[in-house]
Amino acid sequence: MSCVHNNTSFPVQIEAYLKEVYEKYKELQESKDTSLTARFARALKYYQFLIYTAFSDPKFGIGQGENTRGLLIYHQMGMGKTILSLSLAISLSHIYNPILIAPKSLHSNFQQSLLKLIKLLYPETTDHSKELQKISRRFRFVSLDAYNMGQQIIKAGGSLNGCLLIVDEAHNLFRGIINSANDKTNARQLYNNIMQAKNIRILFLTGTPCSKDPFEMVPCFNMLSGRILLPLHYERFYTAYVNKTTNSPLNADKLLNRLVGMISYAGNQNELNKLFPTELPLIIEKVEMSPEQYRQYLLARDVENAEKHASSGMYEKINAAALCLPGSEQESGSSYYVRSRMISIFASEMLTVKEDEKLSEAVQQLPKEAFTENSSPKIVRMLKNIKTSPGPVLIYSQFVELGLHVVARFLEIEGYQCLQPLKVLEEGHNTILLHKDGKDLMVKNFAEDGPTHTLVLSSKITRFTLITGKILSKERDMIQQVWNSPLNIHGEVIKILLVSKTGAEGLDLKYGRQVHILEPYWDKAREDQVKARIIRIGSHDALPPEEKTVQPFLYIAVANQKMFYSIPEGSQEQKTIDERFHERGLEKSHLNSAFRDLLKRAAIECAFNGESGCLMCQPTNALLFHENFERDLRLPNPCQPLVKAEVKAYSISYEGKQFFYQKNKDVGLGYTFYEYNPIIKAYIEIKPSNPLYIKLIKHVQAGTTA
């Protein structure tokens, strides 16, 4: 079977194909077959096996010949995107050179997932290290965040020709491309290399596509198709596909036609949702700033407003460039409002930074008296909420020095102890074990041929630790192993984990009961990504049913009311930056969510999963879209909805084939004929324009009805 995605027959063909694959999956699950395909069927979830088969089947079409080059793997966070991609890399490594692109901090995640997959594939083997080394040698890792990423790609394989490219956290790549003002950035260079590559297969892994702006779809699907499938300029894309008045998709049917065959989605199925803990409704804590904090906040806003006016007009050139967001979008990024947002978390007159002194060091040198409710009402409110948690707690802030490090000082003052992994970690020692020795906990780090290093943790002390972008991967791995230990089920070893944006990526945590987001962000998908670190498939299986819940909190700084009303009318900012970011995020989230719904409707599994609104066309074998998007918008939609219904009809046999017909006065010649389509396993109407139609009428009228 071969399918081409630019064809009205593709949706019904893929539905029928996946049904066959699912039946095969169920058979292999129960079999004792030792073939690699059977092993993968037993190792993978059904939704993973569907994509594994469709992508690796040389007869099917995804990524084959002139068809699409790969898939956007849009699977809900915690559903095993890494395992799926590694499965395909193993199966296709004899044909394609696997290159894994991810932030450097996530490279060890792939190694851990690879070991997990090998154990699932070969449960009869006790020593998996040799197989791990053998398979690992086929892979090449490239750091998307490295300054020399281009050189790493050359070292990995010379070029991207003939490679299987796996990009983890792919939304970061899409954002990097549209945030680039020129072609010199890592992200833009990678885009150009992918567009020029020959015989390339691609897997983009993300749980949050279209998180910043629908325009992220442009580089994504251009790379997957290998051509300019979507318009490169922001305004042309918005004119074609975004209704700015209603803040919703425009010409959605035409956009769906272009995207079908390039998306895999898994996440809404009821049987899968049962495997996740329950996410309780978000608690939004609006925290009034203290008078001194608000005074410093207003001074910071004056500086930011002056900088904004000084730079006005500088983005006009950027607006006209291809693959670039307008300047107003760049303005909303991390380089603006940083002062006021950090002061919204913590403000102290005692904080001064000496020459050649790091901000984190200055925070560490502050006396205990600097950490009060007056300097940070937000953190004090958060600590009160944390004390109600029956289990481990995750805290997120975009800001490290004046966010996480300040929280750490508050925790230390409250009597918490910081767990420092480097006290136990040694080079070559990559196995972590926890066990109880009386009332104390022992963390052991050892290698098979080396000494064991032990860290004794008193059960009387409550601990916290941090994961930021600067932490070593071995420290990150140890923290994750200790957190996920059965001995930490209620936070006995690590009660609180503080993470930054970079630190949070790729974490797979168990048992978490609360998530605290210290400041809002105008990209609500980031909040979802943070929550997904502990809301994962099977993450709470060890807990009783009543404890399988996660409570998220979001903290928003609001104006000090007494000072606000003392400011002359007209000079007041009606909303704080926190409030503006939160409201902007909700507005953008509405539009982005609508486009993510379109991605779900275009997913190759949509009809198989029984979702509503799936793109399903009558299989007329016509082109689904015109290559020129502007002309495509003017043409009639070739996708005529496929409607399945039971009808009463008569059977006839013509030239050895069976057909059915109805007498129908509403049709010009008085008959409707149907023929069997083996691909969709259903009867479809024969159009009057088909030469067979007239032959069948003559056959019926000749009185040869069976």
From Swiss-Prot:
Q: Which residues form the Helicase C-terminal domain?
A: 378-599
Under the subunit heading, UniProt states: Part of the viral DNA-directed RNA polymerase that consists of 8 polII-like subunits (RPB1, RPB2, RPB3, RPB5, RPB6, RPB7, RPB9, RPB10), a capping enzyme and a termination factor.
GO CC annotations, alphabetized: virion component
Q: What induces it?
A: Expressed in the late phase of the viral replicative cycle.
Among Pfam families, the record links this protein to: Helicase_C (PF00271), SNF2-rel_dom (PF00176)
Keyword Amino-acid biosynthesis in annotation: no
Entry protein name: Termination factor NPH-I homolog
Localization per record:
Virion
Where is the short sequence motif DEAH box located? 168-171
- E.C. code: 3.6.4.-
- Report the function annotation for this chain: Putative DNA-dependent ATPase required for providing the needed energy to achieve the termination of early transcripts.
Superkingdom assignment: Viruses
Classification via InterPro entries: Helicase_ATP-bd (IPR014001), Helicase_C-like (IPR001650), P-loop_NTPase (IPR027417), SNF2-like_sf (IPR038718), SNF2_N (IPR000330)
> PANTHER family, per this entry?
DNA ANNEALING HELICASE AND ENDONUCLEASE ZRANB3 FAMILY MEMBER, SWI_SNF-RELATED MATRIX-ASSOCIATED ACTIN-DEPENDENT REGULATOR OF CHROMATIN SUBFAMILY A-LIKE PROTEIN 1
Give the GO terms filed under biological process for this record.
Answer: DNA repair; DNA-templated transcription termination; replication fork processing
Q: Which family does it belong to?
A: Belongs to the DEAD box helicase family. DEAH subfamily.
